[in-house]
């Protein structure tokens, strides 16, 4: 009964993770359409790739016992493919400055994964020590992946806008981490359960922020130039220009702008 329940939770976790990995398709369709990465960050996708690489390796028979963690291999293998595509698209449309940022995070991830596989395969002789080593690296990778939206959450709080924190990405992150937490506990595997003990509360926090700010727009000031012309003297037409800051979230300023435009 326990094994069947664990397998069922693993299948549900696969489904939730698949939704999590495919959620950025909406974001990258926007990037592709506008041919710009705008204010989106590539850091979460690079960290997700690192997580997928580590846990695919963790689930293979060279680290785990036989195919006891097959669900990890299947879903993280798909994740590697999807995240690689997302990172390529981001890099292609990113500004030169953003491309440097991608390289600074992407190269250490690949080097870190290479070292992890080499050390676990060549230094340790048994599954127990390999799982302990790779699982420890996976713990860091998972916390980095689930914690990477903290950068976006900070932006949400500053701008009071959820434009760059899509709902489905936050929801599927919470759902996937909750299911993998249950899977790890049922498997008595702390290396699977521990990172999701951190990820689940972070997912809840993202959802709280989303629902708090979802109906609010960016509060960044917008500059408007209003011109008033004096037509009493055709030869000397005076033009008065002044600048006002418009708070797009303020009904009062909207009314003042409408009145000013009718002068």
Curated annotation (Swiss-Prot):
One of its GO terms (cellular component) is plasma membrane. The keyword DNA-binding does not apply. One of its GO terms (molecular function) is sugar transmembrane transporter activity. Residues 29-42, 93-103, 154-165, 212-263 are cytoplasmic. Residues 1-7, 64-71, 125-132, 187-190 are extracellular. Pfam families: MtN3_slv. The chain crosses the membrane at residues 8-28, 43-63, 72-92, 104-124, 133-153, 166-186, 191-211. The keyword Transport applies. Mediates both low-affinity uptake and efflux of sugar across the plasma membrane. This is Bidirectional sugar transporter SWEET3. It comes from Arabidopsis thaliana.
């Amino acid at each position: 009964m326990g094994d069947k329940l664990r397998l069922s939770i693993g299948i549900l976790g696969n489904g939730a993770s698949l939704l999590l990995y495919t959620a950025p398709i909406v974001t990258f369709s926007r990037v592709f359409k506008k041919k710009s990465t705008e204010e989106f960050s590539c850091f979460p996708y690079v960290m997700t790739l690192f997580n997928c690489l580590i846990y695919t390796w963790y689930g293979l028979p060279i680290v785990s016992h036989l195919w006891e963690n097959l669900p990890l291999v299947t879903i993280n293998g798909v994740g590697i493919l999807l995240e690689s595509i997302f990172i390529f698209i981001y890099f292609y449309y990113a500004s030169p400055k953003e491309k440097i940022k991608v390289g600074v995070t992407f190269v250490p991830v690949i080097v870190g994964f290479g070292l992890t596989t080499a050390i676990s395969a060549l230094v340790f002789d048994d599954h127990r020590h390999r799982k302990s080593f790779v699982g420890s690296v996976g713990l860091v990778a998972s916390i980095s992946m689930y914690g990477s939206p903290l950068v976006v959450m900070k932006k949400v709080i500053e701008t009071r806008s959820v434009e760059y924190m899509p709902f489905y990405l936050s929801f599927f992150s919470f759902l996937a981490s909750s299911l993998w937490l249950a899977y790890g506990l049922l498997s008595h595997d702390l290396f699977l359960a521990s990172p999701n003990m951190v990820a689940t509360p972070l997912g809840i926090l993202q959802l709280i922020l989303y629902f708090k700010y979802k109906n609010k727009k960016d509060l960044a000031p917008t500059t408007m130039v209003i011109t008033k012309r004096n037509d009493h003297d055709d030869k000397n037409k005076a033009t008065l220009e002044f600048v006002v800051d418009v708070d797009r979230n303020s009904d009062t300023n909207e009314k003042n702008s409408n009145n000013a435009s009718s002068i």
